[in-house]
Amino acid sequence: MPDPAHIIAGHKAALSNPHVSEEAKERARKYLKEHGSESHYTTGTTRGQKADADDAGELREEGFGTKNQFEDNESQAKNLGNVRGGYKAAMHNPKVSQKGRRHAKELLEEVDDESK
C-alpha cells in the first residue's frame, strides 16, 4: 500500500507544477482538502530541503528505534566481510589503476588490523 505521506507529497507537487492541467490541480486540491494537506512524517529530503527535525523524536516516542543496522555483532561482521571483499576485488580488477590497487591493499590491511 502506498505511503500516505508520498500520496500527499504527490498532490502538493501537482499543485506547484506548471505542466499539470487545471483539472488535475483541482483534483489534487480536492484530495488534500478531504484527506488533509499535512503528512505526519516527512518522506525525506527533496531539493536540499531538510526533513522535519521532530520526526526522529516522534518515531522514538512511538517505539521505533533509531539503531544503526550495523550495530549488532552479526551485521557488523557481515559488513566487514563485504568491505574486505570489495577491497580484494579492487586489487584484482584489471580496470583499477595501480595506484587504486595499492590504495585498496592499504585499506584492506587497515581493516584487517582493526578487526584483530
UniProtKB/Swiss-Prot annotation:
Q: Which UniProt keywords apply?
A: Cytoplasm, Nucleus
Which intervals carry biased composition (Basic and acidic residues)? Answer: 49-64
Q: Which residues form a coiled coil?
A: none
Compartment annotation: Cytoplasm; Nucleus
Q: Name one Pfam family in it.
A: Con-6
Compositionally skewed regions (Polar residues) per UniProt: 39-48
Spans annotated as Disordered:
32-116
GO cellular component terms, alphabetically, are:
cytoplasm; cytosol; nucleus
Q: Which InterPro entries match?
A: Conidiation-specific_6 (IPR018824), UPF0654_domain (IPR052670)
Q: Where is it chiefly localized?
A: cytoplasm
Please give the superkingdom of this protein's source.
Eukaryota
What does the sequence similarity comment in the record state about its family?
A: Belongs to the UPF0654 (con-6) family.
Name the chain's protein: UPF0654 protein C869.09
The organism encoding this protein is Schizosaccharomyces pombe (strain 972 / ATCC 24843)
